[in-house]
């Protein structure tokens, strides 16, 4: 933790806003550049603008963080090094990252730049933080859904610097777990192009249209003391696509209350609300898992009824000492803090007529114009009978200020970047390569996998001999009897020569983690193949609590590029699942050693802490499906996972790629998975009989931008 209580982190969509939020009191600013940012439709910064922004901020003791918080394709990864290098050399303070491959590359090639993991990484627990710390991560941006109590525990257990969202728009889905916009229209949130389908109306179980997936804006200004007690260091304001007046106004109020430590007045709270909100404010996630009062229910227009005046540009105070003596070089020494610079001109000559007036000379030096500086005091030592032309005084001032500016900025500059040879980042461990080669030479050169979430599905699937591997969902089992029930299923399946993996939940919050740790020793004794993991918490736990168990990454542990895949496999992972947003061409050009492909299944569009069941019918803690219907009359199943307390919203149609298995084999894929989630036994039979009436190809043909 840093010395100060908080860092106030503000958004900036352009250079004008960056300067405005800094003048309004931001300690740090996050921006997007021309590539790899999660706001692809924002103006974003050109290279020239971003370099100017870095200098402007550093002169004022403010940090600049660059968003590289999207998933990067293989075809793009080679551009990353050159893109970052110019900013790294200039002193960029940190990069905010989603892709584990980008984390690996930055840690390798840009050793003195901080790495902040994005909320897109969906980190919800201490074990996720522990895993990421192995890659040189210096700060973790917590998932917005994580409570203050959870943050406090994470900070106490790991000591990691934590960043939390404090103000602005809330996604309905856990960030990084949303494919809604991607699947419906090809605009991927993982690529910075979300079309915000959560802000549209839906019919729930035949009732009138409601904005059931739209959350109110976050406002945590009344919880500053509690955020401090929880160990949060950086307070993040959302809004890189917001206007200058909004950004500056919000920063101004947060700055005031951070510094004063006073309770927030009702009048100021209303003024903040007037700057902009969607149907009011909420800070519910800080204290509760979810709540119906967080939802807008009505059309979530962003309403702004007030504009704070733009802050005036404040100049930086410097001291000066002017020395003009006959026969000696004229000098102007300027100082800011502990940094000084001395500029010189030609030796001063004697006056032939009127000598130089001391006040006139000081006034001339004081004319700093449109520079960033102004003199607080100028000490002058001027001979009695000397003359210096105005042009020479102007040059002396310009050279002094320019030299001081360069010297102030030079301490941020870096020259320690390592040469990038990306091929060295993509290698897989030798045992993985050998295993794949052995698999390739086998008579049966591919594996068929099924995953199931219910007992009825398992009872149906066990009768099909075509499946070599079964993924059994963690939440099929009652917690009190999990070990015994799972052991029975493993024994039953292994008698049929089937391999078994335990498929862990999409979200693994503290309660789930504690339970998992408590059963780990007994679970490790069960003779099953390993785990399918869906988050960084599970990856760390399975890596450290079990011996001889394989770990497979599910599709949402994104291996969009070969560097990401290598990063995971170096930490003991045995296999990965091809990300759902890659198209056939991209799949052909990735390293598919150890990869499996989902060739059937309803794609999950959202994983959410808020519960559609609870918010429409009340919470009865009974798992069942209800359906959302959109304006095109498409129905989306919502499944409530009550043990882990999250919802999954599924696509209206299943994706079916079984006819493409031959092509996928050519791409080097050897394992093919049928992912059963919401299907009844009758629907499973239709899948196995190749009689699915309606289905989609997902992103196999089109992909995402």
Residue positions per predicted region:
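Hydrophobic alpha-helical bundles that form the membrane domains of multi-pass transporters
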Residues: 135-136
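Active-site pocket-lining/capping segments in soluble small-molecule metabolic enzymes
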Residues: 2-123, 141-145, 149-234, 241-705
